[in-house]
Each structure stands twice: as C-alpha cells, then as structure tokens.
C-alpha cells in the first residue's frame, strides 16, 4: 500500500526499483505484480489485465539490506517532498554504495495505482545532481508521457507543452522537476496528473515492523 501520513491508504504500490543506495549496489526490484502461479488466484486484485498481490513480506537475515531498501523508498519520497527547498549550488544527498566509483549514478523508480490509474515515476542522481527524471501515467492502460528530463532539459508530453513554463523558471540541477511543478500546480489547484501525482508521491512512507 501507499500510505498517507494523516489520512491512511491512498493507493496501491505496484513496483519499486533502486540501485546504488547504501548497501544496495546493483538494481533490485520489489514488485506487487503476481507471477504465473495461479494457486491463490482469488487472493489477487485484478486491474486492467494486471494481477496484483494484496500483501507482501520482505524478509532476510541481518545485514541483508532490508532496512536500506525501506530507506531508499523513503528517500525517494523525501526528495519529492523536500528538493524544492534546495538552494542553488546545494548538493543532492546521494548515498552511494561504499564500492561505487566517483560519479556513479543512483536510481529510484516507483509505480503505483491511484483512483484506478497507474503512474510511473523515477529519477537518477549523478555527481550529487539530478541527471534524469520522468513521469508517465496510463489512462485506459496506455502509457502517456507527462514529462521526461535529461539534465536541465525538460521534454513535456504533448498535452503539457504549455503548462510547464513557470515550473522551468524554478528548476535547478538539485531540484526534482516533479517537486517544482507539483508545488506550483498544487497552489493553483490545477495541473491535472502532475499535481495529483505530486501530492500522492510526497506521502509515500514505509516503516519496518
């Protein structure tokens, strides 16, 4: 589930991927999408052809990376929520694996359902700056680009080309574009999917039991 700090469940997590975060070196994937085994088919949630697990457990011995996996997920949410506050020249707090080479990238990507629509968002940090970022959503099951980012260059989807000018004015190398655009659209009560996803992704919070 995707949890809101005050109002409870707001959506369903589908997948989270990360790499080069603390003890996590190579990319790992946590997925709530069911495999081909249909033994417990009645326990699954079905949506637009996806077979989704209702519950999952992360387990393993001490030192296997469970805590750092949760830390990576919470870091992803923290960046969406807080990076707008970073000042020009301030470095992004990248937490590389101890064996990573200088300048090696760290990546984070999340997918979840909200109001029946699937969203996919991710970003890459390199040399303590935002190197790449993207946001898609899937109305009627088909992928639609909201924006893609490479360095300081933003490529909006067709229906968003006239919407992002004010967001670009506050974009910095250490700020996520989602944070810039989401904050502005949230204040205006506009922005459609960008505003909705910003509000939801900023509330991603997980904890160990």
Range-by-range predicted roles:
Residues 14, 106-108, 174:
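Structural beta-strand/beta-sheet cores of well-ordered domains, especially the beta-sheet scaffolds
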Residues 26-30, 117-121, 145:
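Short beta-strand segments
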Residues 18, 22, 112-114, 137:
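Short acidic, glycine-rich loop/turn motifs
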Residues 120-209:
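Electropositive, glycine-dotted interaction segments
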Residues 2-75:
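Pre-Walker A-like glycine/lysine-rich segment at the N-terminus of P-loop NTPase domains
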Residues 45-51, 57, 61, 70-121, ...:
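Conserved P-loop NTP-binding catalytic core
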């Amino acid at each position: 589930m995707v949890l809101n700090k005050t109002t409870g469940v707001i959506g369903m997590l589908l997948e989270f991927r990360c790499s080069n975060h603390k003890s996590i070196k190579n990319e790992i994937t946590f997925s709530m999408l069911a495999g081909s085994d249909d033994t417990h088919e009645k326990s699954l949630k079905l949506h637009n052809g996806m077979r989704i697990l209702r519950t999952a457990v992360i387990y393993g011995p001490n030192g296997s990376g469970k805590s750092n996996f949760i830390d990576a997920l919470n870091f992803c949410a923290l960046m969406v929520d807080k990076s707008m506050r970073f000042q020009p020249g301030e470095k992004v707090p990248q937490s590389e694996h101890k064996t990573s080479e200088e300048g090696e990238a760290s990546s984070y990507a999340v997918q979840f359902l909200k109001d029946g629509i699937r969203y996919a968002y991710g970003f890459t940090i390199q040399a303590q700056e935002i190197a790449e970022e993207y946001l898609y959503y899937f109305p009627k099951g088909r992928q639609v680009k909201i924006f893609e980012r490479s360095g300081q260059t933003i490529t909006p989807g067709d229906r968003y080309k006239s919407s992002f000018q004010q967001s670009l004015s506050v974009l910095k190398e250490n700020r996520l574009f989602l944070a810039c655009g989401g904050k502005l659209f949230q204040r205006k009560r506009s922005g459609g999917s960008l505003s909705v996803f910003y509000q939801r992704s900023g509330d991603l919070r997980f904890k160990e039991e």
